Design a protein with these regions (language model features):
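Non-catalytic, surface beta->alpha helical segment in thiol-disulfide oxidoreductase systems
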Residues: 77-109
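Acidic beta-strand-to-loop metal/phosphate-binding motif
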Residues: 21, 74-77
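Local sequence-structure signature of Cys/Sec-based thiol-disulfide redox active-site neighborhoods
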Residues: 10-47
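Structural motif corresponding to alpha-helix initiation and N-cap regions
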Residues: 2-6, 56-60, 94
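Thiol-based oxidoreductase modules, predominantly thioredoxin-like and allied folds used
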Residues: 42-61, 70
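Short, hinge-like loop/turn segments at secondary-structure boundaries
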Residues: 39, 67-68
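N-terminal leader/targeting and pre-domain segments
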Residues: 1-19, 109-110
Length: 110
């Protein structure tokens, strides 16, 4: 991954409390997995930045290398990689996602 791509990824993570690297946008997800994570965050009423990896091939490949995670979407909360769709879904269902958001002081629907 080139430095420009790495810096772009790091900037998104550093400047957004909750950042979702996804296919499509929060209002128009382009895959079911991105839609699922977006919906979970919307149900919790968490403000988040959706980064459309389909707009930039280097970004799409780079985020996988950056996180050492092979799939998209990828969720970051307060600069920490949380996981992809399956992990986020499991955390949402068992209450762990809500707890992390609360513990990190992020506003959401309680």
């Amino acid at each position: 991954m080139d430095d420009k791509t790495k810096n772009l990824i790091q900037n998104h993570i550093d400047t957004n409390e909750v950042c979702l690297f996804m296919k499509g946008t929060p209002d128009a997800p382009q895959c079911g997995f991105s839609m699922a994570v977006t919906n979970m965050l919307k149900i919790l009423e968490v403000n988040f930045k959706g980064v459309n990896v389909l707009e930039n091939e280097k970004l799409r490949q780079g985020i996988k290398e950056f996180s050492d995670w092979p799939t998209i979407p990828q969720l970051y909360i307060k600069k920490e990689f949380v996981g992809g769709c399956d992990i986020v879904k499991e955390m949402y269902e068992n209450g762990e996602l809500k707890k992390i958001i609360e513990d990190k002081g992020i506003n959401f629907k309680k």
